[in-house]
């Protein structure tokens, strides 16, 4: 499997990936509205040149915000490899902090990031209600039956 910058992945593949996994390439979170198929990032492709993992992020003045991280095949190191690649891109730019926002229902992501050194930093109560006004396809309930209401900011200081 190959990790390559998203700018080298055909845009129609990236757009289709987000359509399938998120309902659209648009991500609405408390930090802004993003078209993920236009962001910097990395994709992991299998031998058939199909996307099996994708990370997107934006660089701010002194930090990097991960906007999306998806792995089609769980527990194979894809998410970890993509996250490490994004952290490496931050270090190359001398960025010392990387952060992300996830929702309260995303127990798997909360565990994944904390195991990799990310800390809970802030809670945005009812933030998903605001996001749902801009992107109504955001469900009320997650697959695990937890109501999707709040956003959590996780932060990691890079060495």
UniProtKB/Swiss-Prot annotation:
It comes from the Bacteria. PROSITE patterns: GNAT. InterPro entries: Acyl_CoA_acyltransferase, GNAT_dom, N-term/lysine_N-AcTrnsfr. Gene3D superfamilies: 3.40.630.30. Pfam families: Acetyltransf_1 (PF00583). Residues 1-139 form the N-acetyltransferase domain. The gene is yxbD. This is Uncharacterized protein YxbD. CDD domains: NAT_SF.
